[in-house]
Amino acid sequence: MVNMVDFYRSLMMGVAISVVSFGHSLKRMEPGMIGQYGNGLKSGQLASSLYMFMFTNEFLVSSGAMRIAKDFIMFTKKDGLLTCLLLSRTFHEMYSLKEVSVLSILVTCCFDALFEQFERISGASGTLIVLFNLRRIETGDFELNFDAPYDVRLSNFEEQREEERNSLRAYLSVLYLKPHMKVYLRGKKVLTTRILGTLLYPYKYNYTAKNMKTCAIKEFERCEQKVREVNEMLRMTSSALGEFEAKYRGQNIHTNKTLRMEQRLLAKARSDMEAKKDQAEKRAASAMKAKNNPTPLTFYFGINIHHRNRYGCMLYNNGRLIEMYVKVPVQKEKNDLLMKCLGVVGVVDVPYSILEPTHNKQSFENKREYLSLLRAMNDHMEQYWKDINLAGSEGPSGVKTFWKNFGYENSDWSSECTNLAEYRKKRYMRIGHTIQCDKCLKWRHVEYHAPYEINGIPENWCCNDHPNSIFRGCSKPEEMPKVHIVLFSQFYIIVVHKKIE
């Protein structure tokens, strides 16, 4: 059994129901939300457990932690209202059900034991997710291994592949491109990473895809259709409220509890539709602007000197990681002797109007556009390799010397660098530290600081702990490392310097 608790604001009952309803999305018209359909709560859970219990006071969840069981229950607590929702794949499989309407719920445990679960949500609001009937592998062991005290790892992990594929803690650290929340795993804080702050020689390239105009037009058409649908729903809810008021005009409905509740529900339905109409119209206006002037994609590239075996393209969708360390052709070639583009990490945040993620957030729907994106990243990565000129005039030996200076003495590319103080200091002196404040959650860039290099970043690091007094205090704006912006032209390349936004 796996438990996940969120101590933030809780879900209202209606929102909680929509969270566990298949095919339902409240985020489609909100471009700022992470992911088009959320973070993969339902699809991730069904790939991992048989039951899920969800106790909520409000919930943020990563599907990376949910692909482990078939069942869950969600408990929510907010404004004195306790809600418990169950989703069971076991039940569906047992009776070969394609769809089911739950009219009543049979709780196998006593109510005292059930309400004890809500006590685990210590604050006034929050959410508790309980996964059980965890999946097992062929040997009978659980798919997830809980032997490590502060981590959850795959039981059949592969030593030579990236740590983020084996470790939930490592995966959560890069799950969001710009994390602004606190995540704890097994009682210990996850030190989230703003990946652009961990790379050497970060370069930024703007790319306008051939299909970007077409995608923008399609997105605008979808938004227009949504506006029409919402207007029709608003007309229907307004009509229902008008009919109610006409029917009971002249009567004192305030003395009738049933009529009062019906009136409130009808008024709320109209109010909700008015809010959705405003939201849809704003989204349509934004889509119109994007249609007339499509925003180019932004590619970032850098060298991962801390872990050179973790390289490839990190593909995000609205700030949420979809695929990691995807090797493009220039990195797949048998170029171990040339070492061309090995150790290079590419980062792109793709809006769903261009590429929609699958429901489990592990891939993209349109394979043709996906492959087109990878080809573009491959071309830009080759240009990046030329721009940084890592080898200099020495060729492959120059690349080998570069890596040797940072402690990579082994010719085996999958091996880690030496942890000798001399080389560790070199790596941190070139990059510094990008740290998130434990209070305000802003990100700070700290130049090389010996205690952090030797002892690591304190778990509860705050802005007041900044070695540079200029940046002490949560009121200070975020200070991020610089990035080289490469402006392409048919005849020349311009490189400028700007801080990462």
Regions found by a protein language model. Name each.
Residues M1-G35, S49-S62, R67-N317, L321-E323, ...:
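Interdomain "switch/hinge" adjacent to the Bergerat
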Residues Y37-N39, V345:
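Short glycine-rich loop/turn motifs that provide flexible caps or phosphate-binding loops at active sites
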Residues N39-G40, F59-L60, K334, Y448:
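Short beta-alpha junctions and helix-cap segments that line functional grooves
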Residues G40, G44, G64:
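Short alpha-helical Gxxx[C/S/T] motif in the catalytic ATP-binding
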Residues L41, F91, Y95, H359, ...:
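Solvent-exposed, flexible loop/coil residues
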Residues G44-L46, L81, E453-N455:
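Short glycine/serine/proline-enriched coil/turn segments at secondary-structure junctions
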Residues G187-K204, C215-E501:
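Conserved GHKL (Bergerat-fold) ATPase module
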